[in-house]
Amino acid sequence: MKDLIIIGAGPIGLACGIEAKKNNLDYEIIDKGMLVNSIFNYPVNTTFFSTADKLEIGEIPFISHNVKPTRTEALEYYRRVCDSWKLNLSLYNEVSEILNKNSHFELKTQNGIMNSKKIIICTGFYDIPYLLNIPGEELNKVLHYYNESHPYYKMDVAIVGAGNSAVDVALDTNSSII
């Protein structure tokens, strides 16, 4: 029986794992995908809006070649954090069910049953697309996540979204269409 199971191996899940380790808890961080799976799925040429120091966890310095780090630098940084802290990770291990057993929680995962006194859920929102329920959104050419502009060459494109990411996608796809 673990003291703590953390679901989600993104930056918040890793920060929780570091705190668990500092407090000598028997813990495990599990994720249905890879380490910082959502960051891996960001567009390849992503540059963060935050400076490197705002993304730091566990007193490990995040050194970037620029004022704002890239996706590649972030992936390397979070691997370094895990190695530095020797975090307990169980990757590619999806949780299918969580049962409250009064004195503890039972988690059914693809690798078997896990039991823990406490759980923290740090799954984020990246894997849950916001669907608009409009005709055509189920077509093969409609994507819910953007990676790069190449697939949109010579196509009319509609971008549904708001904020900085939508503007970045609009600028990137516009440069590939022209």
Features from the language model and the residues they span:
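Rossmann-like dinucleotide/flavin-binding elements
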Residues: 1, 6-32, 145-178
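FAD-binding core/adjacent interface of flavoenzyme oxidoreductases
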Residues: 1-7, 22, 37, 41, ...
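Flexible, glycine-rich phosphate/dinucleotide-binding loops
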Residues: 13, 36, 48, 98, ...
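Glycine-rich active-site loop/strand segments that organize a redox cofactor
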Residues: 37-76
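Short glycine-enriched loops at secondary-structure junctions
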Residues: 44-45, 126, 163-164
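Internal, well-ordered alpha-helical segments in soluble enzyme and binding-protein domains
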Residues: 74, 138, 165-169
